[in-house]
Amino acid sequence: MLLGKFIKTLNYTAPNASIVHVEIDARDGKNAYVNIDSPFTALPAALQGADWVQADNRDALYSAVDLMELAVANHATVWIAHDHRLPPPNWLTKQFKPANLTMNVAGQTMNLYRHDAKANASLTLGANTENTRLTEGNMYLVFVAAADKTP
């Protein structure tokens, strides 16, 4: 059983986990985050129709090595939209490649990273930043789309 079209399971360990969930069919006008008015605008083509984790933006500075764990369907592409103001954490740069695409969420530019998952992949995603001195930033967003969706 899938939570969405491409996300099979999700485990979210931050303080606001009870309201975080998987949404389907990403498109302009839908809210990026569960807790603030944050409609997608000019969503890149590769993300349109994707599943995404509708995270709580208040969890942006929460620190955990296993903040999110998800299993995805066969041959999916996992995308991370990460706030350009924050240095990318090690888990992001080790598992994902910069996609040279951006999007805007809640007034901030988000850099996109991609990971081409193979058969029934599971991923563990950590904290949004490793710098505990930061005081602001958008929570990263996770999108999962069919592998044939390219930028």
Language model region names:
Residues 74, 82-86, 129:
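A mature extracytoplasmic/lumenal domain signature
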Residues 59-60, 64-77, 113-121, 145-147:
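Extracellular and analogous surface-interaction loops
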